[in-house]
Each structure stands twice: as structure tokens, then as C-alpha cells.
Amino acid sequence: MKDHECETYQTMQHPQRPYGLLGKTLKHSFSPQLHAAIGAALGTSYPYILFEKQPEELASFLRGDSWAGLNVTIPYKEAVIPYCDALSDEASEIGAVNTIVRDGERLIGHNTDYAGFRALLRENGVAVRGANCLVLGSGGASKTVQCVLRDLGAAKVTVVSRSGDVNYTNASQQQDAEILVNTTPIGMYPNNGQAPLYPGSFTRLQWAVDVIYNPLRTNLLCQANKAGMETVGGLGMLIGQGIAAAELFLGRAIPQTIGAKIEKDMLLEKENIVLIGMPGVGKTTVGMEIAERMGREFYDIDQMTVYDDGREIPQIFAEEGEAYFRQLEQKIVLSLANVTGAVIACGGGVVTREENYYALAENGRLIFLNRDLTMLPTDGRPISQAVPLARLYRMRLPLYRSWCDAELTITGMQPDEAARHIIDML
């Protein structure tokens, strides 16, 4: 069931006031799906919808009675505080509210982001005690992150803002930073592909954490991954704060163990399966098999490039050259950057442009299909014909391995067997 269908269904089945997410732009949100999953895990359900409001609508909405409880996101985590009759200890200390519940006629502001972010760090093994931390952004989410880091014993917490003493023009001077946390919306769907700064400029950086969960891995995290750092996306934080909020909404304790299963299920549903490897290795055939077995959309970048240009690949190479083809290919790759839950088969040379990596990795699990070179066909494959296959393989192997999240050798496998292996890896 799609998110919007889930919302409509829940509202129809529950005539009582809904819970929901309050924000300005909510196209990126997974929250309705998350709360549906929490309800299902508890053997119940509760209506949860999105409330997109402009700043001038905030007062009348919060003073109205059209909702039972709220989660609050950018840019209203601080703006809602004057409308709350009381704040929890965490919300009061942090100065930001992400959950509002009703107590009779009173509105009580809470901060469940604190629990969510703390759980995210714990579950991913991010050792904060004694570490120098750099926090990007100075809004409500930043205040929560700063509080958690200090409570966990960080040696230093430095905030980077647009106009502060430490800003984006001089942040790279913070060379003692060991943990970087992005709390800005830069890189969030639909503006994928952006990053507030380059993490590779910090020589001591060990961890890059982003509270953004859509895309699953922001451009910032992809850059950090390429630079050899450990990375953590924001999906686990979303789920942790959502469970804490649901406890407040429903007035009952919820086992934290359900979070791991919800995260695994959401990741499996949202993450693309991206196949890379040599020309002729079987990416299209195996990809189609995976898509059929999992009921997913299938995208073949070579086929899409041919359709877009109107000429077959050998003709494009012969008439325009490889550089022209790579530009066409990159255009198709970038058009798929916001796609989720699909299977994508890439051309063999997609790894020759680093920009393609970031577009594919933000929402994708990249799997390198490897096969004995003697079994690779070369007909209709211009590069395989122009360059000796063994040489081409030696040139590209380091790229395939630096890009991939997993490698599977499929020599001797039938497509259905290879597809089963890949599905089992997820």
C-alpha cells in the first residue's frame, strides 16, 4: 500500500482526530509509513497524516482542535514553543520541540529527537566520549544533537552556522574534528546531490552522521564513505524518535526491539539494488530477474540512453565518440537519483564518471557482478571491442570495487541463481 493510500485508509477507518507531522514542506517524509508500521507491530493502528502549513497558518492550526497529537519538523521546532502550555525537561533544556500531545486543554511539548539521536549513535557504535565533534547547522535539530553529544561526554562540540564565528567558509580549519554531524536540510529530497561542505578536508574525521533520512545516504555521507570514513544516515533516528512519540500519543510503553525490524523493512523497501560490472556480465538479465521476483520497477541505463538518443550504442560511439555517450549516460543516471525501491542495471562504463557514484549511492546498494572474462560477450559493445578485454578489466576493477557495497562472482550461475544470491544478501 502506498503512503498516501495508507493515510487515506487510516483516516477513513478512524473518524477521531488524527495524529500527524507538522512542517512546511513534507514531500520527503516517511513518517506516515513509520507510524503505520509501529501500529502494525503493536497489533493496532492510528490515523497519521501530513500537515503542511505556512508560517502564517501556524497559530490558528495549533490553537485548533483538528489533530490529536503532532510531530514537528523543519522549520517549526522552535516556532511551536510559545503555543505550548508546558515543556518536558528535554524540550526545555534543548529549546526545541518535535512532539506535541494534548493534556485536556493544555498542549505539552516534548523532544523525542533526543532519544532518537542517542539511540542512533549507540546502535551504530559511534564513540562520543572524549571526541571532538563538529555540528553543521544551528536550528532546532542542531540543539538536540549538541545536547546529546555533551551528555555523552564529547570533549568539544563546535557548531558551524552560516553567519557564526565558525561558518562554512572557515569550517575546514577545525582539523581536530573526529565526528561530524549534519543537522541542516542541505542534501534532503528533492534536492539530492548537495552537501554543506566536503568531509574529506578534515584529516582526523572518523565518523560522518547525517540526521537526514531521505535520501538514505546524503551526498555528504557518500563523500565521506569515499574518503574512508564510517557513515550513519538518519533513518534510525527517525524510527527511534517515532517510537518515543508513539508512546506519548498512545499512552503505553513500546518495546524498543520493534525499531530494528521496522528499520530493516523500510530499508529493504526504499533502497535500490544497483548492479555494476563489466560489459556483458549479465547485469540486465539478472536485474530483470530480481525485479520480477521482488515486484520492483526495473531501469536499464543503457536501454534508457538508447531510447533517449534514438541510436544504438555502437552507432553513438562511431558517430559521436565515447565522451558524448558518457554525457548522455550521466544525464540518465542523474534522472534516477530520486528513485527508490527499484532495480537499476548500469552500463559497464558508468564508473568512469565519479558524479554517477553519488547519484546511484544515495538511495542504492551497489553490487558488483564479476565473471570469468572468457565468458563475456563483446558483440555490440564498442569499448570491449576497442580495448582488449583483459586490459579494460584491469582498468575498471579498482573502480568497481571502490564503488560497490558487495561483490558477487557469478561465473557458472544462471540468472535466477544469481538473483537469488543477491536477494539473500539484502
Placement of each model-derived feature along the sequence:
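Glycine-rich adenosine-cofactor-binding loop
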Residues: 23, 111-114, 121-122, 126, ...
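NTP-dependent small-molecule kinase module
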Residues: 260-269, 289, 293, 381, ...
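Conserved lysine of the Walker
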Residues: 283
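A glycine- and Lys/Arg-enriched "phosphate-lid" helix/loop adjacent to the NTP-binding pocket
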Residues: 362-399, 406
